[in-house]
Structures are given as structure tokens and as C-alpha cells.
Amino acid sequence: NEVAETAQKKGIALTGEMTNYLHSLDSTRPVTCGINIFFNFLSSIGLGVYSDDKAEKSAENAEKFAAEQAKKAAAAKPEKKKKPVGSEFYNTLACLVGDYFMKCGATLYPCDLKTRDAYANMDIAGYNYGIFRYKHDLKKYPNRLILGSETFCKDAYSFWEIAKKNKRIIGDFVWAGWDYIGEVGDGAAEYSDYKFEDPSTRMTGGNGRIDLNGKPRAEAAYTRVAFERETGPFIAVDPVYQKEKLRLTGWQLTKALE
């Protein structure tokens, strides 16, 4: 999931090898991979993510790096904060520019160039935040099956309307269905007077449709209605009024409680 190597030649080849290997274990099950479409484009221009060249240089300098780290540990000097890479880079960018920008970014032409070969090496194309590409790609690739391998909660209704009209859209996974320990604060709400700066002050992502204790949130009710599994009505209550504006990330539709 969100492995940027799928934009590189070695990663594309490895995708095919892994698909074939999985087929050898069980020929009845289709293989997919969650590819962050915009993320792959960013990787191709070297922004905060993997490339074949970077990987080769890293391998060549592995021993030197280990020695430097040992010296730093011995000196016990505080290190400068590292720039985010991988999914952390994408999450940080999405929090800064918003989910709409990220979904629009996935429609750029180079995004297709940096995903099509990897998709050709699997049975089902996994789209992370690529809902704006669905209709276009269904026409361009008539044999492609599409799975929403990661989507924002607010896109549930849009997904369902497209899926009802297109049988090659086979499913949708929201990020995240259940809150989890890790990626702390990427779905959290905050006020400016309680600005999130120290990751150690939080334990969970804060973005599940179901909270860490198993209680469905208001977003779960919205999803059930959007997918025509419930008719409602559902009543949800916003957090207590504050003078400061409540800030939500793209992974959180609302902080209302059912």
C-alpha cells in the first residue's frame, strides 16, 4: 500500500513478480495493490519519496550511514528533525493543502504515466484517493477493474453513485474504517489555542468511522446512508461551541457524535 516503487522500473517489474507468485499459491484470488496515484507522480520528480537512483545510493552508503548513526548515538546530541518521506510526506502535504487538491492532483496526465504499468501487472487496480479518475480510466482502459483502496469519508456518496453505474468499480475502502494507534493526529480536530505540535501528546490517528473502543461515530452513520444500507434519520451533535474555528484534516468529515 502506497509503495512508491510502483512508479519506477524495478518496482513495476517486482509488482509483476509478486502477482505471479501469489497466483502460484492460489490461482483463484485476484491480486491488487493500493497505489496513491498523485504520490507516484511526486515520487517520479523526487519529492520526498523513493526512486531507483536513491535506493542504489542508499545501498552503497549503508555502512557509512550506520557508522555515522553510531557516532551520533554515542555523542547523544539532538538531531535535526528529518523531512517526512513516504506516506508521512503525503499525509503532511494533504493536511496542508486539503483533500480536494490531492484528488485533483491525481487527475494530472503524468499520474497516469506513473501508474499504468504497475496496474497492468496486477488483476485489480487499487486507487488511493483517485476517485476523480474513475470515469476517465474506465473509458481509457476497458479491461481494468478498479478498487477504491483508500478514499476519504466524504466521498462515500460520490463513490456509490459511480459504482452503481459501473460494474468494473468493485469496492471501496475508506481510510480509516477503525481508528488505530499510529500516524497520530492525521484525522484529529484542533483549535488554534490547542495546536497539535508534539506527536507524543496523542496516541491514535483519530480518523476512524469507528473509534478505538469500537463505538461508531457519526461518520459511520453517514456512510451507511450513502451506501443505501440505512434510511435514517440519524442525529449527530457537534462539539461544544468554541470561539476558535475547529480545524479538520481531509481524513475527518466531522467531529459530531451520533
What are these regions (language model features)?
Residues 1-2, 36:
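Short linear capping/connector segments at secondary-structure termini
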Residues 15, 20-258:
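Substrate-binding clefts and catalytic carboxylate motifs of secreted carbohydrate-active enzymes
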Residues 2-9, 206-212:
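Active-site rim elements
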